[in-house]
Amino acid sequence: MVVTKPATQRPRLPSVGRLGLVDPQAAERMAQLGWYDHDDQAHVDLLWALSRAPDPDAALLALVRLAETPDAGWDELGAALLTERPLRGRLFAVLGSSLALGDHLVAQPRSWKLLRGNVSLPTHDELCAMFTGCVDEALADPGSAMVRLRTLYRDRLLVLAALDLAATVEDEPVLPFTVVAAHLSDLADAALAAALRVAEHNVCGDRTPPRLAVIAMGKCGARELNYVSDVDVIFVGERADTVTTRVASEMMRLASEAFFQVDAGLRPEGRSGELVRTVESHIAYYQRWAKTWEFQALLKARAAVGDAELGRRYLDALMPMVWVACEREDFVVEVQAMRRRVEQLVPADVRGREIKLGSGGLRDVEFAVQLLQLVHGRSDESLHVASTVDALAALGQGGYIGREDAANLTASYEFLRLLEHRLQLQRLKRTHLLPEADDEEAVRWLARAAHIRPDGRHDAAGVLREELRHQNLRVSQLHAKLFYQPLLESIGPAGLEIRHGMTSEAAERQLAALGYEGPQSALKHMSALVNQSGRRGRVQSVLLPRLLNWMSYAPDPDGGLLAYRRLSEALAGESWYLSTLRDKPAVARRLMHVLGTSAYVPDLLMRAPRVIQDYGDGPSGPRLLETDPAAVARALVASASRYSDPVRAIAGARTLRRRELARVASADLLGMLEVTDVCKALTSVWVAVLQAALDAMIRANLPDDGPQRGKAPAAIAVIGMGRLGGAELGYGSDADVMFVCEPAPGVDDSAAVRWAASVAEQVRTLLGTPSVDPPLDVDANLRPEGRNGPLVRTLASYAACYEQWAQPWEIQALLRAHAVAGDAELGHRFLLMADKTRYPADGVSPEAVREIRRIKARVDAERLPRGADPNTHTKLGRGGLADIEWTVQLLQLLHAHEVPALHNTSTLECLDAIAEAGLVPADEVDLLRQAWLTATRARNALVLVRGKPTDQLPGPGRQLNAVAVAAGWPTDEGGEFLDNYLRVTRRAKAVVCKVFGS
């Protein structure tokens, strides 16, 4: 007999765990709603619908609160949720996405009925009629008017959000982003109109209100508003009188309390300006005073509410000015300043989470689109549109950007705006911050609210993270292509051309707006690059949009593009070059910054190109910093020692010096090195070159016969003076030296000195031979008797000379003396001898101090070059390097016999000793230190920017901006940099005068 097993009666209702509910009270809340009381298909569908809410726990809690509210009519709502799928989708979606709208529903429990049935979005006019009707009903009781309007506004937000979100829960239509943004703008218009009606009633009573137009700006003006956003407005009155201003002010107050923050900060003169102006007053302001950003803001202007005729007059008068704004003299400067300001607004710790202002974010798209509109809208009325999406379409249609790029950028923009909407809906707070990367719960909620589902490889949160990376990268890449790809297509070979492409005039306009002062030359350089034969031209076509975009942020994009062309032509045979720029964005970006800032480095890179490969990062940080200057110095000397021919030896030394200069200057320009490290590295390589040259010349001049055959007749030491002795060389510094010799056994002094002088002169001549590299000038004029004295002396001769005839300036010069090359033991003995002169046991004589002061006064009066500005000459100007160094040296002369720490050739270390000994108050020493560092940075930056030694800061303009960047100033605002330089050096000069006594 066959026994049949009874079928298992497995419950069909899913458990809270299967539904994704994690709140410990979830089961209790389900029971409270009675949703586990009936095991039927309707309840199964209901529960699975709840599980699809972005946050089912939040939705469940809101439903329980609603059920506990007497006026909600829970029996009716509960029954409707079982049978009405659209209502279920809308309500669960909005409660699982917005805690704030859940609170609103609990406060207004009958509002759930707005989500029932065939719900559609009202038109602009229908919304205005709703709000007007509410005002008419409420004006009998003005105290309740704004409360009722606030409720109506939140109800309309509830309906929109429910329709916007419903597709996350049920199979409902998806509202396009543009529809949502436009409806939010219509809702804002209706709310503003209602607030204006109430304001007129409050201020004017039964009197006729003044004529007032409210111009919507920003996202509201462009009809692309967020769920939560300030609404930017400008007020235009028939008269700018007290009553009109009171109405405008009252309208702002009412709307800000009831709906959203109303901001009139875009008005002429900003918050300092009059709240209301007439049309004529606006015209006068924009004709005379308005900045470029104010014309950019007018791109979005729209007459929203109030007096329509006034609004029309305002727009008719001002909009033509928008389309000629790019002809203004300061257009490029202001546009670049706006880009920088936007980037600096974002704190570093949240930059990766900023959906609006971060890299590859919304502002990148909006700014680029608006700039292209301003540049090309003058000659193309199809670009006279307000919304970003419409403008992208028009730019693609007009050939100003590729149509595929326009479509991709629009898709990325709408995706990022969708996330922005979802983030704001949660608490109805203005925010643009994505959740923390490790906040799994928040990321998962955002993914579900944005209707992102698992893809088989990742859960919803993982898919969102991948999509964000993809979209940010795409925006960043398209941001560059947006500006430059059409330019390249307009100059490229036939295979690259597109229909409706950009004309040469439009291309020149666009390049000028992007900061190129010579757009015609820039186009020629671009054409030469992309039209190279074979693979190189194709790779350049791919690379250039990104490279040019990065270069446009540099102070001198014209010079940078020329340098890039020269570099590319010089390295045409190096296969690694373009591959590195293509595959390593960090290298390419840093290279563009260097080329667009410096005239000094490009020539070095052409002859030492492998340094470019070090622009990337290694495991321990920037590879430019992996090189040890001391190791470079040893390698340089060793390399030169392999050659018997001095010319070849010095050529080998120059090669390594060139590479080291390129490395140090590149790291300096990229902000990787402190100025003191730069000076030490430059000193190290100079010392190595001196050692290599001296060794080579000694080898070449060894006697061929006689008792000294193959042996040097004398030992030679090179004493570094000035900045070389203090290890404070800059890019444009000469090497101040003295040569000292000591005869070999059996060689008389005169023969030894003759031989050593010949070697020293050959060292100077060989190093000073003109070449394509930065010069190697050796200056021996600080020796006793200056130019009139012998080039080389014996140690005994130096001792006798200093003991008997040392002049005050010679004593002062010895304060910086340091043995740098040649015979180390002889150099050490020279310094011991010099100590007796520069640090005498009883201090220097009062007469010597007076003479130093007199010479300083004469230097101040006579040494400054003709035409130089004494305030901005970094070496001899007020509070410049000479002032600080002479002050330190005077204090050394006065106190070194008492303060051993002053037996030092370094300016900064002596300043530390001066402060430690209390010779000058610490705060004043700090002023001297800051001035020395500031002037040294500026002087180095001048050489980096101009490519040749100079000490005079330029006046305001592009070159000063470049100097500011090269000197490490946080922006390329040359004026700010100059103000800081003047302030720092002025304060230091006061200390200098105090120490010198006059």
From Swiss-Prot:
Spans annotated as Adenylyl removase: 1-487
Coiled coil regions in record: none
Region: Adenylyl transferase, residue numbers: 492-998
Entry cofactors: Mg(2+)
Keyword check for ATP-binding: yes
GO term, biological process aspect, one: regulation of glutamine family amino acid metabolic process
Enzyme Commission number(s): 2.7.7.89, 2.7.7.42
CDD domains: NT_GlnE_GlnD_like
Lineage top rank: taxon: Bacteria
Residues spanning the signal sequence: none
MF annotations from Gene Ontology: [glutamate-ammonia-ligase] adenylyltransferase activity; [glutamine synthetase]-adenylyl-L-tyrosine phosphorylase activity; ATP binding; magnesium ion binding
EC top class named in words: transferase
UniProt keyword Lipoprotein, yes or no: no
Function text: Involved in the regulation of glutamine synthetase GlnA, a key enzyme in the process to assimilate ammonia. When cellular nitrogen levels are high, the C-terminal adenylyl transferase (AT) inactivates GlnA by covalent transfer of an adenylyl group from ATP to specific tyrosine residue of GlnA, thus reducing its activity. Conversely, when nitrogen levels are low, the N-terminal adenylyl removase (AR) activates GlnA by removing the adenylyl group by phosphorolysis, increasing its activity.
Protein name in the entry: Bifunctional glutamine synthetase adenylyltransferase/adenylyl-removing enzyme
Organism name: Mycolicibacterium paratuberculosis (strain ATCC BAA-968 / K-10)
